[in-house]
């Protein structure tokens, strides 16, 4: 049976997410995917430059030294750190760790994730700079 009744469709503006700080932060966090795509493309070009020999690699390094690219890469780093922070804050909510019949709070998990990140960063920098 068909009906001629028209369903109510609530109007939604394109700026709905600007009304609440929670939604603005959510859109910012989801927007961190754009700098991640930039870095991925930059990394792929770097790998191809490395594959194509010393002159190509020197051109890629010159490209990376451009002040505009340095600023874009700093923005990308900030976006990656924001994404990491929010991801680490989400991790304790997904894992129920019970110690002595009590649920562990989020602080030890978040601090241990940051500690692992710092250690991994130091190891990678040591290998890259001194190996």
From Swiss-Prot:
Pfam families: Fumarate_red_C (PF02300). InterPro entries: Fumarate_red_C, SQR/QFR_C/D. One of its GO terms (molecular function) is succinate dehydrogenase activity. Keywords: Cell inner membrane, Cell membrane, Membrane, Transmembrane, Transmembrane helix. It is a multi-pass membrane protein. The chain crosses the membrane at residues 30-50, 63-83, 109-129. It is found in: Cell inner membrane. GO terms for cellular component: fumarate reductase complex; plasma membrane. Part of an enzyme complex containing four subunits: a flavoprotein (FrdA), an iron-sulfur protein (FrdB), and two hydrophobic anchor proteins (FrdC and FrdD). Belongs to the FrdC family. Two distinct, membrane-bound, FAD-containing enzymes are responsible for the catalysis of fumarate and succinate interconversion; fumarate reductase is used in anaerobic growth, and succinate dehydrogenase is used in aerobic growth. Anchors the catalytic components of the fumarate reductase complex to the cell inner membrane, binds quinones. This is Fumarate reductase subunit C.
